[in-house]
C-alpha cells in the first residue's frame, strides 16, 4: 500500500514535514490502522509542535479516527497554534534591489514555502537573471503556505508587483 511504501522509505527523507505527517496519518487511517494513524498525528502535533488549518481535520480520510479523544486533543492543540500563526502571517518577497538585468518572480506551490520554491527555481539564476521569491500570507500548515484565488492571493501579488521598481529593468 501507499502507507507501507511511505513508512518503509521514511528514513530516506531529510526531515518529516507537516505535509508528510499528514500523508502518514491519513494513509494509516484509510488503511484501517487507527493506532498508527493516531500515533502519527500525536507525533506531529504533540511531540513536534506542528499545526494545520482546521479544514485538514475535516478530511474524510480521517473519519474512522475522528471520534477518538486523542484526535480531538490534537485537533484542538493544532487549532490554537493555527490561530496564533494567523496573527503573525504576512506576504514575504525576497526582492530588495536590482542585481541582474532580468527579473524572475517565483511563487511557491500550495503546501510549500520560499525555501522549497528555491529548490525548483534557483537553476534560472545566472549572469542575466535575478530570481526572487514570493511567499503567501495564507497559511496552510506549519511553515507551509498556499495561494487562494478567492482569498488574498491576488491582492498580495498586486502589492508585491507594485513594490518593485520596474523602471530599473
PLM features: residue spans?
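Alpha-helical solenoid repeat scaffolds, predominantly canonical TPR units
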Residues: 5-6, 40
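Serine-hydrolase catalytic machinery in alpha/beta-hydrolase-like enzymes
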Residues: 101-168
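A domain-start/cap signature at the N-terminus of enzymes
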Residues: 46-101, 155
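Residue at a conserved register position within TPR or TPR-like alpha-solenoid repeats
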Residues: 28-31
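Structural register within alpha-helical repeat arrays
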Residues: 23-24
Amino acid at each position: 500500500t501507499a502507507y507501507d511504501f511511505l513508512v518503509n522509505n521514511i528514513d530516506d527523507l531529510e526531515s518529516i514535514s507537516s505535509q508528510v505527517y499528514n500523508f502518514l496519518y491519513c494513509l494509516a487511517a484509510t488503511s484501517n490502522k487507527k493506532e498508527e494513524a493516531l500515533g502519527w498525528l500525536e507525533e506531529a502535533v504533540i511531540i513536534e509542535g506542528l499545526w494545520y488549518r482546521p479544514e485538514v481535520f475535516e478530511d474524510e480520510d480521517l473519519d474512522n479516527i475522528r471520534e477518538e479523544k486523542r484526535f480531538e486533543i490534537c485537533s484542538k492543540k493544532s487549532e490554537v497554534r493555527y490561530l496564533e500563526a494567523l496573527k503573525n502571517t504576512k506576504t514575504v518577497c525576497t526582492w530588495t534591489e536590482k542585481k541582474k538585468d532580468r527579473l524572475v518572480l517565483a511563487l511557491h506551490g500550495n503546501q510549500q514555502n520560499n525555501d522549497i520554491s528555491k529548490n525548483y527555481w534557483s537553476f534560472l539564476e545566472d549572469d542575466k537573471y535575478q530570481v526572487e521569491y514570493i511567499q503567501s500570507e495564507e497559511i496552510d500548515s506549519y511553515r507551509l503556505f498556499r495561494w487562494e484565488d478567492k482569498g488574498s492571493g491576488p491582492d498580495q501579488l498586486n502589492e508585491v508587483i507594485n513594490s518593485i521598481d520596474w523602471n530599473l529593468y
